[in-house]
Amino acid sequence: MNGVLTITADDLAFDTACLALPAGEAVTIVLVNADSQPHNVTIYTDSSKGTELFAGEIIEGGETIEYEIPALEAGTFYFDCTVHPAMNGSVVVS
């Protein structure tokens, strides 16, 4: 990884269920919204969504955005689209 990870939202799904990020390094996530619905990426400590680690701006269908994710410690976290919570997965930081 060169510090940039691209994910695509299409047909109410992300193209991956697992985001692998390096521990202790800030990264850029590029969200490509190929859907007609609005989407975003939000990262939480776990699937209960108790603590938000990052909240991405919601973008409309056809748009692309770069999110600057701050450095995270090693661990397994959770991400979803706050508009469509069934669009979710794990964030593995190592």
Show the residue positions of the predicted features:
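N-terminal edge beta-strand
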Residues: 1-26
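Residue-level signal for beta-strand positions within conserved beta-sheet cores that form or flank
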Residues: 3, 37, 87
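Soluble periplasmic/extracytoplasmic beta-strand elements of cell-envelope proteins
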Residues: 6-8, 28-30, 42, 80, ...
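Secondary-structure boundary/capping motif
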Residues: 10, 28, 54-57, 82
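Residue-level signature for short turns and capping positions that connect secondary-structure elements
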Residues: 12, 34, 46-48, 84
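Extracellular/periplasmic metallocenter environments
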Residues: 13, 59-94
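Beta-strand cores of secreted/periplasmic/IMS beta-sandwich domains, seen most often
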Residues: 17-37, 41, 65-73, 77-79
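Histidine- and aromatic-enriched segments that form or immediately flank copper-ligand environments
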Residues: 36-61
